[in-house]
Amino acid sequence: MTRVVLAAAYRTPIGVFGGAFKDVPAYDLGATLIEHIIKETGLNPSEIDEVIIGNVLQAGQGQNPARIAAMKGGLPETVPAFTVNKVCGSGLKSIQLAYQSIVTGENDIVLAGGMENMSQSPMLVNNSRFGFKMGHQSMVDSMVYDGLTDVFNQYHMGITAENLVEQYGISREEQDTFAVNSQQKAVRAQQNGEFDSEIVPVSIPQRKGEPIVVTKDEGVRENVSVEKLSRLRPAFKKDGTVTAGNASGINDGAAMMLVMSEDKAKELNIEPLAVLDGFGSHGVDPSIMGIAPVGAVEKALKRSKKELSDIDVFELNEAFAAQSLAVDRELKLPPEKVNVKGGAIALGHPIGASGARVLVTLLHQLNDEVETGLTSLCIGGGQAIAAVVSKYK
């Protein structure tokens, strides 16, 4: 079977809600990475066969945001593109689709990843097209409804985390401790420059003066403690334990990678970072969607012909501390190998981009001692996706 390799992998810094990227469309974030990858690899843009990009909150952006990003990123009009929506798994699903298209021989070179600007998601006025006869009308927050609400139960993703709290007997202190650890690891990694190799700075033009250049993730917080987090009120349930402090944030960002057949990489003298070994997807009851990574991880390992003990490093998306703790309990993961540079609770969770972001962060950890990695994300609606990669040899 054709070996599929990852030849370049980058991400933007992750902006907080209403932060540095609030006026930067998702497709501009994606375009920045596309342009960088082309420049970095020296690849002829016309040699790219397809562009596949995850993006969840598409309302108001224009037709096919992936195509917009591709064209603005400098690709010729002959290169096709399409947008993927698998909620939080969109970015990783895009990479899987790229992988599948190369294995089947349809493509040789694909740019794949994810992008999201949650700050720019519009408010919707449903049923207004033909006018209102009378009475009050309300707006729907497209970010909350299309990105963060379980449509089957009509409640926020946070309630699915509360459901896992009850099912697994997870305490508030455990969640807050997990969140503090995520922040501390991210602070340490940021201060040590461990994200520098994976981040492409984003230049934001200003009406007056020089552009603002964003180089670091905005959500990383120093001096976070369990004591401080314990003062926060429950966010989703009156007597609940899930708070803004032990859940991932609402964020803006993008991540992208160059997916190629090994033969094409050799032909073009491009040195790959890693080999894609296999993927797994799984579904569960939507009310406990956060536990779905367990099944996805098991499938990805089986298809990759690997055991959990073979994995040197894990990048698992931290949608909620409770969700992450539940998955850890089921899989019995070694904590020293999981999210060693912090996770989404600290870094942020731009939903359409996160699937690619966790893989980018994972790839930049591979070396002669850390050769095999696994990444996974839970997905609203009761799903999950996972991937296994190995350092290229």
From Swiss-Prot:
It holds the Pfam family Thiolase_C. It catalyses: 2 acetyl-CoA = acetoacetyl-CoA + CoA. The keyword Cytoplasm applies. InterPro entries: Thiolase, Thiolase-like, Thiolase_acyl_enz_int_AS, Thiolase_AS, Thiolase_C, Thiolase_CS, Thiolase_N. The active site is at C88, H349, C378. It is found in: Cytoplasm. It comes from the Bacteria. GO terms for molecular function: acetyl-CoA C-acetyltransferase activity. It is an enzyme of class 2 (transferase). Belongs to the thiolase-like superfamily. Thiolase family. This is Probable acetyl-CoA acyltransferase. It comes from Staphylococcus aureus (strain NCTC 8325 / PS 47).
